[in-house]
Amino acid sequence: MLSTVFRRTMATGRHFIAVCQMTSDNDLEKNFQAAKNMIERAGEKKCEMVFLPECFDFIGLNKNEQIDLAMATDCEYMEKYRELARKHNIWLSLGGLHHKDPSDAAHPWNTHLIIDSDGVTRAEYNKLHLFDLEIPGKVRLMESEFSKAGTEMIPPVDTPIGRLGLSICYDVRFPELSLWNRKRGAQLLSFPSAFTLNTGLAHWETLLRARAIENQCYVVAAAQTGAHNPKRQSYGHSMVVDPWGAVVAQCSERVDMCFAEIDLSYVDTLREMQPVFSHRRSDLYTLHINEKSSETGGLKFARFNIPADHIFYSTPHSFVFVNLKPVTDGHVLVSPKRVVPRLTDLTDAETADLFIVAKKVQAMLEKHHNVTSTTICVQDGKDAGQTVPHVHIHILPRRAGDFGDNEIYQKLASHDKEPERKPRSNEQMAEEAVVYRNLM
């Protein structure tokens, strides 16, 4: 309901935000007090959302301290931020928490949290791109030694100020992530950061303005500034860029705040004036994202309904489900969500996704069933043996000598018609799907 209300009011809405610039160090309480003062000031100014930079919690003296001070998202320290959100009726973008992974404490995630005015987490994004640089005798900065890369894309989140795409710092150099967020409906892009002094001087504003212009989005970039310890210094210059590429708010190089008005009707106007996304040549190039779907309901397979508990993996374009009458142990089907009979009916994006998903499922099945061979087959049309007029890929793990002189194709063409091959029960199929779902 909340998301629906936002979408109805965002189109012409104007919203006031605060962007915070900090100099975090290894004193967590001092960092919190600095953030608290800024959040309180934003509350007094009736801001709807406050943006804090990457490493708002702390910046350690060394790799070991970065690891040792990491915390859970529901710890006592984070509860203080949730209480501030509730107290001031304000949303928080907490740009980069050192988020401890219980299964791998030596490599925390760098997590961007969105907390609503009730203190509830609305989104968690783990930084995808880690900055690793080693030039012998000159510089060594290996983020992967004390942090772990995220493994999934997080769709833009509905907030009171608009639909917000989440990124962190180094992610700004990878335009595909911003493009994906824009295509998923983002009106704003956020880049909480701790840019180094040299790269900040050269690229900070240029990168932020580029992401704003090419995606026709507001860009909000809260930043660290100044000397955190004798070994580390950040550039500062937190800023807000409008979708035309104009810097509409900016801090200098000290601990400070800047404020900006987000006018979502301006986003709509610019996109109407320059409809660049409708001019993209998707017939020549495309952006494929390996994205899992959060959809949990059943789906159509031609005229048949596939129950949700028989589906073990899905993306925005494809889904994978267990077989009613498997030819081999582990025989599953991959199908596009859109009901079309022929492979040639699929878009390029659907085709790419279908076969990428098939490859992932094949790898999982081979490992689980301890086999090294797989038959992957599309029966494209009635004369090719297709009995259900909906494109689907058969994935069949193979064992040595299982079908004599490789008679698998004859078996596939007739297995639905064999009276001795009894359909499995819903319970059997659901149990198998649970196993595969966990493995995927």
Swiss-Prot record:
A motif (Histidine triad motif) lies at residues 390-394. One of its GO terms (biological process) is nucleobase-containing compound metabolic process. Residues 14-264 form the CN hydrolase domain. It comes from the Eukaryota. Signal peptide: none annotated. Its EC number is 3.6.1.29, 3.5.-.-. The active site is at residues 54, 127, 169, 392. The keyword Nucleotide-binding applies. PROSITE patterns: CN_HYDROLASE, HIT_1, HIT_2, UPF0012. The keyword Hydrolase applies. Gene3D superfamilies: Carbon-nitrogen hydrolase, HIT-like. GO terms for molecular function: bis(5'-adenosyl)-triphosphatase activity; deaminated glutathione amidase activity; nucleotide binding. Keywords: Hydrolase, Multifunctional enzyme, Nucleotide-binding. It catalyses: P(1),P(3)-bis(5'-adenosyl) triphosphate + H2O = AMP + ADP + 2 H(+). Residues 297-405 form the HIT domain. Cleaves A-5'-PPP-5'A to yield AMP and ADP. In the N-terminal section; belongs to the UPF0012 family. Homotetramer. This is Nitrilase and fragile histidine triad fusion protein NitFhit. It comes from Caenorhabditis elegans.
